[in-house]
């Protein structure tokens, strides 16, 4: 109905599939009267069709060499395109950025009078680690024991000082341990590895079902963005942090991000397709290989407009490879991919 209603407007413009579906999404959000819409840029930023909105917050994630034929062949050129989403007076959070890339964002934010924050600036206040499923199973009873000990302390205090006991009860409420247990149980039910994030605010940790090493950078960006939204009077509670991070895939439909699709043997699916993404995958594969001395088998395919040679150079040399071609026009034939791999 949407397309038919607006056909006379759209046809002279010859919109792309992405432009048309973006317009449909905006209409759907408006009709549903959503409280918050998270709009992801399709590519770049400055010229992207999503760049007509006036948001409460802009977020620019980590800059990598991708879509170089459209955005430019250097990180600085790509950063200038990304910086095009920075709006007059609208706060902006930047993921990993340094050197010339950071200067691009800083200058653009100054030009637009936009408050700017870098996610990495507060990284020292957060500890993060990848926790295997087996280790998560050990953490669960430890948390139970901690809660039990605190309740026993409160009961003992009640006999001596009601005021101190009430203070301890308040501290227990602030820690919100029952909610921590609930979200940990949700991840345990999925039989997944997790990333544990903790600091003074969350001493028993936040757990996210995303366990790719590259998610560390994303977590810093998320936490900074949530803190900024809180300052903008968004009512984001500690249990919202926990529930959101523990159920990312269910809430968003996210797939293919270091996604374990089978155990014994472990089968992991990842859609990394540029040098930055593959570097993280390479590090994590090496860690698995060294820790568990497991053989690695890789089913590998790419589209032809990516920097395939640079990606192949990063992949482990001692793995067994199965080259494949996806059912899309841009996919590189498997025999050509294998030839490039042998030369890498």
Q: Which role does the model predict for each range below?
A:
Residues 1-53, 69-71, 99-100:
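ATP-dependent carboxylate-amine ligase catalytic core
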Residues 31, 36-41, 49-51, 55-59, ...:
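Nucleotide phosphate-binding/pyrophosphate-handling subdomain across enzymes
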Residues 45-47, 54-112:
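Conserved catalytic-core segment of NTP-binding enzymes
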Residues 95-96, 110-136, 185-186, 209-212, ...:
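Beta-strand->loop->alpha-helix junctions that form or flank phosphate-binding loops
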Residues 98-104, 108, 192, 266-268, ...:
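C-terminal helical cap/extension that packs against the catalytic core
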Residues 125-129, 137, 141, 188-202:
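Acidic-glycine-rich active-site phosphate/pyrophosphate-binding loop
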Residues 136, 143, 147-150, 165-168, ...:
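Generic L/I/V-rich hydrophobic alpha-helical segments across diverse proteins
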Residues 156-166:
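Charged, low-complexity interaction regions
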């Amino acid at each position: 109905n949407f397309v038919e209603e607006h056909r006379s407007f759209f046809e002279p413009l010859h919109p792309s599939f992405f432009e048309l579906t973006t317009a449909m999404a905006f209409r759907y959000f408006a009709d549903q009267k959503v409280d918050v819409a998270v709009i992801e840029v399709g590519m770049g930023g400055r010229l992207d069709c999503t760049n007509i909105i006036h948001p409460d917050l802009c977020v620019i994630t980590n800059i990598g060499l991708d879509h170089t034929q459209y955005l430019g062949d250097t990180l600085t050129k790509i950063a200038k395109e990304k910086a095009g989403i920075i709006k007059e007076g609208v706060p902006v959070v930047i993921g990993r950025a340094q050197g010339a890339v950071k200067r691009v964002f800083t200058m653009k934010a100054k030009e637009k009078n936009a408050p700017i924050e870098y996610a990495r600036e507060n990284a020292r206040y957060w500890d993060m680690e990848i926790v295997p499923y087996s280790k998560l199973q050990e953490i669960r009873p430890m948390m139970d024991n901690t809660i039990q000990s605190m309740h026993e302390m409160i009961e003992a205090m009640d006999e001596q000082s009601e005021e101190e006991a009430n203070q301890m009860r308040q501290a227990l409420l602030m820690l919100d341990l029952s909610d921590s247990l609930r979200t940990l149980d949700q991840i345990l039910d999925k039989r997944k590895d997790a990333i544990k994030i903790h600091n003074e605010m969350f001493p028993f940790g936040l757990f996210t079902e995303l366990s790719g090493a590259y998610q560390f950078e994303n977590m810093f960006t998320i936490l900074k963005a949530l803190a900024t939204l809180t300052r903008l009077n968004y009512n984001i509670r500690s249990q919202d942090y926990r529930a959101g991070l523990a159920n990312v895939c269910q809430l968003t439909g996210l797939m293919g991000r270091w996604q374990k699709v089978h155990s014994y043997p472990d089968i992991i699916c990842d859609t990394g397709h540029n040098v930055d993404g593959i570097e993280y995958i390479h590090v994590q594969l090496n860690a698995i290989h060294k820790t568990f001395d497991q053989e690695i088998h890789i089913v590998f395919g790419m589209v032809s407009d990516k920097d395939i040679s640079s990606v192949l150079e990063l992949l482990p040399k001692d793995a067994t490879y199965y080259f494949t071609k996806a059912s899309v026009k841009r996919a590189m034939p498997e025999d050509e991919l294998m030839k490039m791999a042998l030369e890498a």
